[in-house]
Amino acid sequence: METSETIAVLGAGGLMGFAMTRNMARAGLDVRAWNRTRAKAEALADDGVHVADTPADAVRGAGIVVTMLADSGAVTSAFEQALPGLDATTDPHPIWLQMSTIGEAATRLCESIANSRGVGFVDAPVLGTREPAERGELVILESGPEEARPRLQPVFDAIGRRVIRAGEAGAGTLLKIVVNSWVLSVVEAGAETIALAEGLGIDPDLFFKAVEGSSLDLPYLRTKGSAMAARDFKPSFRLSLAAKDATLVAESALVHGLDLPLFDTIAERLLDGALEHGDEDFSATYLTSTPDRAALSGLAEIAGPRRPCPSAAARQPALRKRALRQAVSQPAASLRRAATAAGTRR
Protein backbone atom coordinates (compact mmCIF):
# COMPACT_ATOMS: atom_id res chain seq x y z
CA MET A 1 0.00 0.00 0.00
CA GLU A 2 1.33 3.43 -0.93
CA THR A 3 1.06 6.69 0.98
CA SER A 4 1.97 10.30 0.35
CA GLU A 5 2.38 11.02 4.06
CA THR A 6 5.76 11.80 5.54
CA ILE A 7 6.89 9.47 8.32
CA ALA A 8 9.07 10.79 11.15
CA VAL A 9 11.03 8.32 13.28
CA LEU A 10 12.33 9.41 16.68
CA GLY A 11 14.99 6.97 17.85
CA ALA A 12 16.30 5.98 14.43
CA GLY A 13 19.82 5.11 15.56
CA GLY A 14 19.15 2.14 17.83
CA LEU A 15 19.39 -1.51 16.82
CA MET A 16 15.67 -1.66 16.16
CA GLY A 17 14.98 1.91 15.10
CA PHE A 18 17.73 1.95 12.48
CA ALA A 19 16.52 -1.22 10.78
CA MET A 20 12.88 -0.14 10.87
CA THR A 21 13.65 3.31 9.46
CA ARG A 22 15.75 1.89 6.65
CA ASN A 23 13.03 -0.58 5.70
CA MET A 24 10.46 2.22 5.55
CA ALA A 25 12.72 4.21 3.24
CA ARG A 26 13.46 1.19 1.05
CA ALA A 27 9.73 0.57 0.76
CA GLY A 28 9.42 3.97 -0.90
CA LEU A 29 8.10 5.96 2.07
CA ASP A 30 9.14 9.57 2.64
CA VAL A 31 11.03 9.31 5.93
CA ARG A 32 12.57 11.88 8.25
CA ALA A 33 14.58 10.72 11.26
CA TRP A 34 16.13 11.89 14.50
CA ASN A 35 18.42 10.21 16.99
CA ARG A 36 19.93 11.64 20.16
CA THR A 37 23.37 10.58 18.93
CA ARG A 38 23.11 11.78 15.35
CA ALA A 39 26.10 9.77 14.13
CA LYS A 40 24.23 6.51 14.73
CA ALA A 41 21.53 7.53 12.24
CA GLU A 42 23.59 9.31 9.58
CA ALA A 43 24.02 6.19 7.42
CA LEU A 44 20.26 6.29 6.79
CA ALA A 45 20.88 9.22 4.45
CA ASP A 46 22.20 6.68 1.93
CA ASP A 47 18.63 5.37 1.66
CA GLY A 48 17.15 8.83 1.17
CA VAL A 49 16.21 9.51 4.79
CA HIS A 50 16.44 13.13 5.97
CA VAL A 51 18.36 12.98 9.26
CA ALA A 52 17.28 15.92 11.40
CA ASP A 53 19.17 17.69 14.16
CA THR A 54 16.18 17.95 16.51
CA PRO A 55 12.91 16.10 17.10
CA ALA A 56 10.98 19.24 16.13
CA ASP A 57 12.76 19.37 12.78
CA ALA A 58 12.19 15.65 12.21
CA VAL A 59 8.40 15.85 12.65
CA ARG A 60 7.89 19.03 10.62
CA GLY A 61 5.38 18.17 7.89
CA ALA A 62 4.97 14.58 9.09
CA GLY A 63 1.60 12.87 9.22
CA ILE A 64 2.86 9.91 11.27
CA VAL A 65 5.39 10.13 14.11
CA VAL A 66 7.01 6.85 15.17
CA THR A 67 8.81 6.57 18.50
CA MET A 68 11.23 3.66 18.95
CA LEU A 69 13.31 4.45 22.02
CA ALA A 70 14.77 2.62 24.99
CA ASP A 71 12.39 3.61 27.78
CA SER A 72 9.50 5.81 28.80
CA GLY A 73 11.71 8.73 29.79
CA ALA A 74 13.32 8.82 26.36
CA VAL A 75 9.93 8.51 24.62
CA THR A 76 8.19 11.33 26.48
CA SER A 77 11.24 13.58 26.30
CA ALA A 78 11.60 13.12 22.52
CA PHE A 79 7.92 13.69 21.85
CA GLU A 80 7.82 16.80 24.02
CA GLN A 81 10.78 18.19 22.07
CA ALA A 82 8.98 17.32 18.83
CA LEU A 83 5.72 19.10 19.65
CA PRO A 84 6.80 22.59 18.48
CA GLY A 85 7.35 21.18 14.98
CA LEU A 86 4.12 19.19 14.80
CA ASP A 87 1.09 20.76 13.13
CA ALA A 88 -2.06 19.31 14.70
CA THR A 89 -4.37 21.55 12.66
CA THR A 90 -4.02 19.44 9.53
CA ASP A 91 -6.82 17.23 8.29
CA PRO A 92 -6.37 14.41 9.01
CA HIS A 93 -4.56 15.04 12.29
CA PRO A 94 -1.07 13.59 12.80
CA ILE A 95 -0.82 10.16 14.42
CA TRP A 96 1.70 9.28 17.12
CA LEU A 97 2.63 5.63 16.48
CA GLN A 98 4.29 4.62 19.75
CA MET A 99 6.25 1.38 19.17
CA SER A 100 8.63 1.36 22.14
CA THR A 101 8.12 -0.98 25.10
CA ILE A 102 7.36 1.38 27.98
CA GLY A 103 4.76 -0.18 30.28
CA GLU A 104 1.16 0.54 31.24
CA ALA A 105 1.40 3.82 33.13
CA ALA A 106 3.73 5.44 30.61
CA THR A 107 1.50 4.38 27.71
CA ARG A 108 -1.51 6.00 29.37
CA LEU A 109 0.54 9.16 29.89
CA CYS A 110 1.60 9.22 26.23
CA GLU A 111 -2.02 8.86 25.14
CA SER A 112 -2.96 11.75 27.43
CA ILE A 113 -0.22 13.95 25.97
CA ALA A 114 -1.34 13.13 22.42
CA ASN A 115 -4.99 13.79 23.17
CA SER A 116 -4.19 17.12 24.79
CA ARG A 117 -2.52 18.27 21.56
CA GLY A 118 -5.09 16.98 19.09
CA VAL A 119 -2.81 14.17 17.91
CA GLY A 120 -4.07 10.63 17.31
CA PHE A 121 -2.43 7.91 19.38
CA VAL A 122 -1.74 4.29 18.46
CA ASP A 123 0.09 1.95 20.82
CA ALA A 124 1.90 -0.70 18.77
CA PRO A 125 4.96 -2.32 20.35
CA VAL A 126 6.72 -5.00 18.34
CA LEU A 127 7.93 -8.54 18.83
CA GLY A 128 11.35 -9.33 17.43
CA THR A 129 15.01 -8.44 17.81
CA ARG A 130 17.60 -6.94 15.47
CA GLU A 131 17.57 -9.71 12.86
CA PRO A 132 13.79 -9.78 12.27
CA ALA A 133 13.81 -5.98 12.28
CA GLU A 134 16.46 -5.98 9.55
CA ARG A 135 14.43 -8.44 7.49
CA GLY A 136 11.20 -6.48 7.96
CA GLU A 137 9.63 -9.43 9.78
CA LEU A 138 8.54 -7.93 13.09
CA VAL A 139 5.20 -8.83 14.68
CA ILE A 140 3.25 -5.66 15.46
CA LEU A 141 0.85 -5.55 18.42
CA GLU A 142 -1.49 -2.79 17.32
CA SER A 143 -3.97 -1.06 19.63
CA GLY A 144 -5.86 2.19 19.27
CA PRO A 145 -8.55 3.65 16.99
CA GLU A 146 -9.30 1.23 14.16
CA GLU A 147 -9.84 4.09 11.72
CA ALA A 148 -6.10 4.86 11.94
CA ARG A 149 -5.13 1.48 10.46
CA PRO A 150 -5.34 2.38 6.74
CA ARG A 151 -2.94 5.29 7.23
CA LEU A 152 -0.53 3.13 9.22
CA GLN A 153 -0.65 0.08 6.95
CA PRO A 154 2.21 1.22 4.67
CA VAL A 155 4.45 1.52 7.73
CA PHE A 156 3.36 -1.89 9.01
CA ASP A 157 3.95 -3.44 5.58
CA ALA A 158 7.48 -2.05 5.50
CA ILE A 159 8.60 -3.29 8.91
CA GLY A 160 6.49 -6.32 9.78
CA ARG A 161 5.25 -9.68 8.58
CA ARG A 162 2.18 -9.77 10.81
CA VAL A 163 -0.09 -7.34 12.67
CA ILE A 164 -2.12 -8.48 15.67
CA ARG A 165 -5.04 -6.26 16.59
CA ALA A 166 -5.07 -6.12 20.41
CA GLY A 167 -7.88 -3.62 21.08
CA GLU A 168 -8.05 -0.09 22.41
CA ALA A 169 -4.89 1.95 22.99
CA GLY A 170 -2.82 0.34 25.72
CA ALA A 171 -3.85 -3.22 24.93
CA GLY A 172 -0.82 -3.65 22.67
CA THR A 173 1.47 -2.82 25.57
CA LEU A 174 -0.36 -5.25 27.86
CA LEU A 175 0.03 -8.02 25.28
CA LYS A 176 3.72 -7.18 24.90
CA ILE A 177 4.17 -7.46 28.67
CA VAL A 178 2.56 -10.91 28.64
CA VAL A 179 4.74 -12.11 25.75
CA ASN A 180 7.86 -10.66 27.38
CA SER A 181 7.17 -12.61 30.57
CA TRP A 182 7.32 -15.80 28.50
CA VAL A 183 10.36 -14.86 26.40
CA LEU A 184 12.43 -13.71 29.37
CA SER A 185 11.47 -16.80 31.36
CA VAL A 186 12.51 -19.11 28.52
CA VAL A 187 15.89 -17.42 28.06
CA GLU A 188 16.66 -17.34 31.79
CA ALA A 189 15.69 -20.99 32.19
CA GLY A 190 17.85 -21.83 29.19
CA ALA A 191 20.77 -19.91 30.67
CA GLU A 192 20.59 -21.89 33.89
CA THR A 193 20.21 -25.16 31.99
CA ILE A 194 23.33 -24.51 29.90
CA ALA A 195 25.26 -23.41 32.99
CA LEU A 196 24.14 -26.54 34.85
CA ALA A 197 25.17 -28.80 31.97
CA GLU A 198 28.63 -27.26 31.81
CA GLY A 199 28.99 -27.31 35.59
CA LEU A 200 28.23 -31.03 35.61
CA GLY A 201 30.64 -31.69 32.77
CA ILE A 202 27.92 -32.33 30.17
CA ASP A 203 28.32 -30.93 26.66
CA PRO A 204 25.35 -28.56 26.09
CA ASP A 205 24.97 -30.08 22.61
CA LEU A 206 23.88 -33.31 24.31
CA PHE A 207 21.03 -31.41 25.97
CA PHE A 208 19.84 -30.14 22.61
CA LYS A 209 20.11 -33.64 21.13
CA ALA A 210 18.08 -35.04 24.03
CA VAL A 211 15.13 -32.73 23.35
CA GLU A 212 15.52 -32.60 19.56
CA GLY A 213 12.28 -33.10 17.67
CA SER A 214 10.11 -33.07 20.78
CA SER A 215 7.73 -30.41 22.05
CA LEU A 216 10.56 -29.26 24.33
CA ASP A 217 12.75 -28.35 21.36
CA LEU A 218 12.08 -24.61 21.15
CA PRO A 219 13.84 -22.95 18.19
CA TYR A 220 14.33 -19.71 20.13
CA LEU A 221 15.89 -21.54 23.08
CA ARG A 222 18.16 -23.43 20.69
CA THR A 223 19.31 -20.14 19.12
CA LYS A 224 19.99 -18.41 22.42
CA GLY A 225 21.38 -21.53 24.08
CA SER A 226 23.86 -22.07 21.26
CA ALA A 227 25.00 -18.46 21.65
CA MET A 228 25.51 -19.02 25.37
CA ALA A 229 27.56 -22.16 24.82
CA ALA A 230 29.68 -20.34 22.21
CA ARG A 231 30.02 -17.23 24.42
CA ASP A 232 28.70 -15.19 21.49
CA PHE A 233 26.87 -12.21 22.95
CA LYS A 234 26.75 -9.84 19.99
CA PRO A 235 23.65 -7.82 20.82
CA SER A 236 20.40 -8.52 19.04
CA PHE A 237 18.58 -7.21 22.10
CA ARG A 238 20.65 -5.76 24.92
CA LEU A 239 20.53 -7.26 28.40
CA SER A 240 19.95 -3.80 29.86
CA LEU A 241 16.72 -3.56 27.86
CA ALA A 242 15.68 -7.08 28.85
CA ALA A 243 16.13 -6.07 32.49
CA LYS A 244 14.02 -2.98 31.88
CA ASP A 245 11.31 -5.10 30.29
CA ALA A 246 11.41 -7.48 33.25
CA THR A 247 10.73 -4.59 35.61
CA LEU A 248 7.70 -3.66 33.50
CA VAL A 249 6.34 -7.19 33.90
CA ALA A 250 6.94 -7.04 37.65
CA GLU A 251 5.31 -3.62 37.84
CA SER A 252 2.18 -4.76 36.00
CA ALA A 253 1.90 -7.88 38.15
CA LEU A 254 2.10 -5.76 41.28
CA VAL A 255 -0.45 -3.22 40.05
CA HIS A 256 -2.92 -5.98 39.18
CA GLY A 257 -2.42 -7.88 42.44
CA LEU A 258 -0.77 -10.93 40.89
CA ASP A 259 1.67 -13.23 42.68
CA LEU A 260 4.50 -14.15 40.29
CA PRO A 261 7.35 -15.37 42.53
CA LEU A 262 9.15 -17.19 39.71
CA PHE A 263 9.22 -14.11 37.53
CA ASP A 264 10.33 -11.95 40.47
CA THR A 265 13.44 -14.11 40.67
CA ILE A 266 13.97 -13.92 36.92
CA ALA A 267 13.74 -10.13 37.07
CA GLU A 268 16.37 -10.09 39.82
CA ARG A 269 18.71 -12.23 37.76
CA LEU A 270 18.33 -10.02 34.70
CA LEU A 271 18.89 -6.87 36.75
CA ASP A 272 22.02 -8.37 38.29
CA GLY A 273 23.34 -9.47 34.91
CA ALA A 274 22.72 -6.06 33.38
CA LEU A 275 25.01 -4.42 35.92
CA GLU A 276 28.05 -6.02 34.27
CA HIS A 277 26.83 -7.11 30.84
CA GLY A 278 24.12 -4.61 29.99
CA ASP A 279 25.44 -3.79 26.52
CA GLU A 280 25.70 -7.43 25.47
CA ASP A 281 22.89 -9.58 24.15
CA PHE A 282 20.40 -10.61 26.80
CA SER A 283 21.53 -14.22 26.44
CA ALA A 284 24.51 -12.97 28.49
CA THR A 285 22.29 -13.50 31.54
CA TYR A 286 23.93 -16.93 31.33
CA LEU A 287 27.09 -15.36 32.77
CA THR A 288 25.38 -14.74 36.10
CA SER A 289 25.13 -18.52 36.57
CA THR A 290 28.79 -19.32 35.86
CA PRO A 291 30.94 -18.49 38.91
CA ASP A 292 34.69 -19.08 39.01
CA ARG A 293 34.92 -22.87 39.05
CA ALA A 294 38.41 -22.79 40.52
CA ALA A 295 37.17 -20.84 43.52
CA LEU A 296 34.40 -23.39 44.03
CA SER A 297 36.64 -26.44 43.64
CA GLY A 298 35.86 -28.93 46.38
CA LEU A 299 32.94 -26.90 47.67
CA ALA A 300 30.58 -29.87 47.60
CA GLU A 301 32.89 -31.81 49.91
CA ILE A 302 33.40 -29.06 52.49
CA ALA A 303 29.95 -27.50 52.47
CA GLY A 304 27.90 -27.93 55.60
CA PRO A 305 24.19 -28.75 55.77
CA ARG A 306 22.19 -26.84 53.21
CA ARG A 307 20.16 -23.97 54.55
CA PRO A 308 16.52 -23.89 53.49
CA CYS A 309 15.77 -21.33 50.80
CA PRO A 310 13.50 -18.48 51.83
CA SER A 311 9.98 -18.97 50.55
CA ALA A 312 8.84 -17.21 47.42
CA ALA A 313 6.27 -15.37 49.50
CA ALA A 314 9.01 -14.08 51.80
CA ARG A 315 11.17 -12.92 48.89
CA GLN A 316 8.41 -11.36 46.84
CA PRO A 317 8.00 -7.91 48.46
CA ALA A 318 11.72 -7.10 48.43
CA LEU A 319 12.19 -8.33 44.89
CA ARG A 320 9.26 -6.36 43.55
CA LYS A 321 10.26 -3.22 45.37
CA ARG A 322 13.71 -3.37 43.86
CA ALA A 323 12.33 -4.08 40.40
CA LEU A 324 9.94 -1.18 40.62
CA ARG A 325 12.64 1.20 41.85
CA GLN A 326 14.76 0.23 38.87
CA ALA A 327 11.80 0.65 36.53
CA VAL A 328 10.80 4.13 37.58
CA SER A 329 13.99 5.75 38.87
CA GLN A 330 15.37 6.99 35.56
CA PRO A 331 12.23 8.10 33.68
CA ALA A 332 10.38 9.47 36.71
CA ALA A 333 11.44 13.09 36.30
CA SER A 334 10.64 13.08 32.59
CA LEU A 335 7.24 11.51 33.22
CA ARG A 336 6.42 14.19 35.79
CA ARG A 337 7.42 16.93 33.35
CA ALA A 338 5.29 15.37 30.62
CA ALA A 339 2.30 15.03 32.94
CA THR A 340 2.59 18.68 33.96
CA ALA A 341 2.92 19.78 30.35
CA ALA A 342 -0.11 17.73 29.30
CA GLY A 343 -2.15 19.25 32.08
CA THR A 344 -1.30 22.82 31.12
CA ARG A 345 -2.16 22.21 27.45
CA ARG A 346 -5.72 21.03 28.04
Predicted regions and their residues:
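Hydrophobic beta-strand scaffold residues
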Residues: 31, 51, 120-122, 163, ...
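Rossmann-fold dinucleotide-binding core
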Residues: 78, 101-181, 311, 329
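Helical "substrate-binding/catalytic lid" subdomain
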Residues: 171-285, 289-292
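Rossmann-fold NAD(P) dinucleotide-binding segment
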Residues: 55-119
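NAD(P)-dependent dehydrogenase/reductase Rossmann-like domain
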Residues: 275-346
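NAD(P)+-binding Rossmann beta1-loop-alpha1 motif at the extreme N-terminus of oxidoreductases
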Residues: 1-67, 94-95, 130
